[in-house]
Design a protein with these regions (language model features):
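N-terminal secretory signal peptides that target proteins for export/translocation
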Residues: 1-2
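Bacterial N-terminal signal peptides
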Residues: 5-15
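N-terminal leader/targeting segments
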Residues: 19-78, 96
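Ser/Thr-rich, low-complexity intrinsically disordered terminal regions
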Residues: 52, 57, 113-131
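Long, charged/polar, surface-exposed segments that mediate recognition or autoinhibition
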Residues: 64-123
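A mature extracytoplasmic/lumenal domain signature
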Residues: 86, 118-119, 130, 139-141
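Short, exposed beta-strand-loop hairpins at the edges of beta-sheets
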Residues: 126-128, 134-146
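Short, low-complexity, Pro/Ser/Thr/Gly-rich segments in the mature regions of secreted, periplasmic
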Residues: 143-158
Length: 158
């Protein structure tokens, strides 16, 4: 009888749940992991727990790849970076950067703001008021002449 009551309650709540989900756009699939990257940035170990194999220079692979992003890596001890999917034109990359900016801001919530004096039309800086962490979203051209949006999380050294 208890199981039947629980099943009924679950089924009765389905329309309300579906309505609530459709009323609010779904968070991008990388939100939880992006928040985790930001949280790791301010720990004593920084990104050591997600560091993978060494790459040329001072880069390392990362064990924490943001869903929908590619070529995620660590640079030094305090920088995490990922590229978006490649696009054909710079205009597409600019539009994607604007959309991703809105997504990232919604993922991270209050406390994050654009720093206009450090931003440009193709480069946006977000800073957290309470923690020494910044995020940049910039456009770049690959060696194969395609365009990407690059997300970079780094620890500010003020």
């Amino acid at each position: 009888m208890k199981r039947l009551a629980m099943l009924f309650l679950a089924l009765a709540s389905l329309p309300a749940t579906a309505l609530a989900q459709s009323a609010h756009p779904q968070a991008p699939p990388y939100c939880f992991d992006l928040s985790r990257v930001v949280d790791l940035a301010v720990t004593k170990e920084r990104f050591a727990s997600i560091a993978g194999r060494p790459r040329p220079g001072d880069f390392r692979d990362t064990k924490l790849v943001l869903a929908g992003w590619k070529d995620c890596s660590l640079y030094g001890a305090a920088t995490y970076t990922c590229d978006s999917a490649e696009m054909d034109t710079a205009e597409q990359a600019d539009e994607a950067r604007r959309d991703l900016l809105d997504d990232v801001k919604s993922c991270l919530g209050a406390g994050w703001a654009e720093v206009a004096e450090r931003s440009s039309p193709s480069y946006v800086v977000l800073q957290n008021a309470a923690r020494p962490v910044s995020i940049t979203l910039s456009t770049d051209q690959t060696d194969s002449k395609r365009h990407v949006v690059r997300l970079t999380v780094f620890v500010r050294r003020n």
